[in-house]
Regions:
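PP2C/PPM-type serine/threonine phosphatase catalytic domain
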Residues: 1-313
């Protein structure tokens, strides 16, 4: 395989960095992963760190030199990562669990397979146009799961994440075939919240990937202003010819500290303290019930080629 990987991050207007970004690869496969520690919960940075390390370590152990089944790998690892965060909370006697979103992508045999939980996104672009992006696990991005939106929660509040006692919900994109020159971007909401999808996809092209990643980061920080969100992103360009991967190495080893993604906010006027663990657990249970009721319905396609989605119950 041959590919290029670049990343950028900026703390923006936030006081803390609670994001982690990482990648690792073999001669036949590559893994990208990004996690947003949720600032509304304690130890969000720890949750994000555990998530990224779990994915990286699992890939290193199983990609010899490639994964037996990328989708199965992603599905098993997201559950392991969430449980590892729960175990951390119990071991450190936390009364409230750390939480994080995650998005992870595997490229193997010329195909992209990705998984996400929460609102960290993957964008797949070709020739400056958006081919597909993930859909956030929020009331805004997945309204079809609800007859009515809960009155006490903002439409952007996430209904799933890693770190809950309830197994996380997730969606899988792919496997889909990549073409020479396709670009894949994983990012936090600090990036996508300040530009629309088409602008983001267009921004990935016209310049080398390293410049595109840097320019997108700078634009997001500038638009966010003094009180803007943190911005983190990692991009890959696929090259369909044999050879060694060309990468910008993250540090240390496979991990790099990136920028903190803000926690989902409750509805305007609702004190943040009212959105507690019990409410989150009730919301997740509601989602599971909605999914069970609609299991036989065909979900909207995320990608034009072989869309597949998985929602654990």
């Amino acid at each position: 395989v041959k590919f290029s990987v670049y990343q950028a991050s900026h703390i923006g207007g936030r006081a803390r960095n609670e994001d982690r970004v990482g990648y690792t690869y073999t001669r036949q496969a590559v893994l990208l992963v990004l996690a947003d520690g949720m600032g509304g919960h304690p130890d969000g940075d720890q949750a994000a760190d555990i998530a990224v390390r779990t994915f990286v370590q699992a890939f290193v152990g199983q990609a010899v030199p490639k994964l037996a089944d990328p989708r199965a790998f992603l599905e098993a690892t997201v559950m392991q990562a969430s449980q590892a965060i729960v175990d951390f909370a119990h071991a450190h006697h936390r009364t409230e669990h750390p939480r994080t979103t995650v998005v992870a992508a595997v490229v193997q045999d010329g195909e992209l397979t990705a998984l996400h939980s929460g609102d960290s996104r993957l964008y797949w672009a070709r020739d400056g146009r958006l081919v597909a992006r993930t859909r956030d696990h929020s009331y805004h991005d997945k309204p079809e799961l609800f007859a009515t939106r809960p009155a006490s929660v903002s439409r952007s509040v996430l209904f799933t994440c890693l770190g809950s006692d309830t197994p996380p919900l997730y969606d899988v994109l792919g496997p889909v075939a990549l073409r020479h020159g396709d670009r894949v971007l994983l990012c936090s909401d600090g990036l996508w919240a300040v530009m629309d999808d088409d602008d983001l996809a267009a921004g990935l092209y016209g310049v080398p990937l390293a410049d595109a990643v840097a320019q997108l980061s700078e634009l997001a920080v500038r638009r966010g202003g003094r009180h803007g969100d943190n911005v983190s992103l990692i991009g890959l360009e696929w090259q369909a010819d044999d050879g060694f991967p060309s990468t910008q190495v993250l540090e240390p080893a496979w991990l790099a500290h990136a920028a903190a993604a803000p926690a989902p906010l409750p509805a305007e006027g609702l004190p943040a303290a009212e959105l507690d663990d019990a409410e989150i657990e009730r919301t997740i249970a509601e989602i599971n019930d909605a999914i069970r009721r609609t299991r036989r319905q065909t979900p909207p396609a995320q990608v034009p080629t072989r869309p597949e989605r998985k929602r654990p119950s």
